[in-house]
Amino acid sequence: MQIGKYSLGDPIAAIATALSPAALGIVRTSGEGAIDLASAIFSKPKKLKEAQGNSILHGWVLDPESKKEVDEVTVCVYREPKSFTGEDSVEFICHGGTAVVLKIYRLLIENGFRAAEGGEFTFRAFANGKADLTRAEAVNEIINSKTDINIELAAGRLSGNLFSGIEEIKHELTAVIAAADVEIEYPEDEETSQGAFSPDLILRIIEPLKDLADSWAAEKIFIQGAKVVLAGKTNAGKSSLFNALLKEDRAIVSDIHGTTRDWLEASLNFNGIPVSLYDTAGIRYTQDSIEAIGVERSLEMSRNADLILYLCDPKDILSAGSLNKDDSEFIKNAKAPVITVITKEDLLDTESKEKIKEILKAEKIAEPIIISSKASNGIKALSEKAYSVLAKNTGSSGFSKTASLGSERQRDAVQKALDVLQTAYQNSLEGFPLDLIVEDLEEALSFLGEITGEVRSDDILDKVFSGFCVGK
């Protein structure tokens, strides 16, 4: 059976672990006849063929042609329907050397298995009713998780909280459609139809659906991450802060102006938000053509940032009694939220710090975070402030612990359902014929079905599973 680019039933095999030296490697199989086919390369073929589901065997992988031992392995046996894919399945757990993992995989391919497509195991779990699309997508979320919060969000969807939330809304929407159908079928039977349908019934569905749509805005930054740019004039301390946040010496630190001529990138997280952090060239006019390119890149990256940490040298502010005009204009005109960071805190006394705060307040710039990258003072406060700004910018200070969305695809489907329901609600208030309103309600129900996979197309399935790695 063929669904989109995937077929069902035929035996497939894939390497499920990274191809690099490791303690263990896993080669997995699934499909009709998988147990019998796998027994052809196992030292105890009869035991494997007769093994019960959810059992483990110990033995060797043998090359059927040369009869030579390949590796000592543990074999996990699953019988349909009680497996991840819902099919018979065998997994070989071997030593994790690249050559031995590839050898076992090639032996399986030579003995009747087909190479699996990316995401094909999870697709089969979906097609065989072992998981809906929200759970299938959650599998990929967990694989790609970068922080504990990523894992927590994905685990909630994997456990079925989004599926349950959608099913509850679909149940309520189905009841509204049924109520409208009663009035359509029995317009003159007051005892049967009167009061069965009202616009308020639609409104009661719109509200939780709005909350669900809003959950993506609040959560996507925890899933997709944020782009945080360190900006400021030369020698403001950007590279020192870059190193301090990473807790390693990645960027060259020098008193020479224009040392950083291009951007550096590193990954970290601010209290659970995955961040791509960029150290950029100092912003200044320069006749050095190479440095000028770096400056332009700094400005471009700042325009595309989710958050800018704009660094200022306190000596310049104190000596001038004001913030440099270019710095002030950058902070006030930036498209992204800006946290003003005053560096070299270890060189400032209390009076100087308060003076700087007063100067910035007079120029209507939010209170800065004052740090010392050298002494690590203020770094924690800066990280917490960055988290607060990034989370607030999504419209939430955290994330939903109940049903919540985990992908753009899910958000788009919810928004389409919401748009149709709002139209239906408005039309019902204006007295449109009920049969037209029911058409809108049924369309909304179809959009919600796309989220769980109850309503599906090849395009939807390709969109969901194309991002999966081979072996999952």
UniProtKB/Swiss-Prot annotation:
Entry-linked PANTHER family: TRNA MODIFICATION GTPASE GTPBP3 (PTHR42714), TRNA MODIFICATION GTPASE GTPBP3, MITOCHONDRIAL (PTHR42714:SF2)
Predominant cellular place of this UniProt entry's protein: cytoplasm
Sequence positions that bind GTP: 235-240, 254-260, 279-282
Source organism of this protein record: Treponema denticola (strain ATCC 35405 / DSM 14222 / CIP 103919 / JCM 8153 / KCTC 15104)
Sorted UniProt keywords: Cytoplasm, GTP-binding, Hydrolase, Magnesium, Metal-binding, Nucleotide-binding, Potassium, tRNA processing
Function according to Swiss-Prot or TrEMBL: Exhibits a very high intrinsic GTPase hydrolysis rate. Involved in the addition of a carboxymethylaminomethyl (cmnm) group at the wobble position (U34) of certain tRNAs, forming tRNA-cmnm(5)s(2)U34.
Residues annotated for Mg(2+) binding in this entry: 239, 260
Known EC number: 3.6.-.-
Domain TrmE-type G as annotated: residue spans: 225-391
Name recorded for this polypeptide: tRNA modification GTPase MnmE
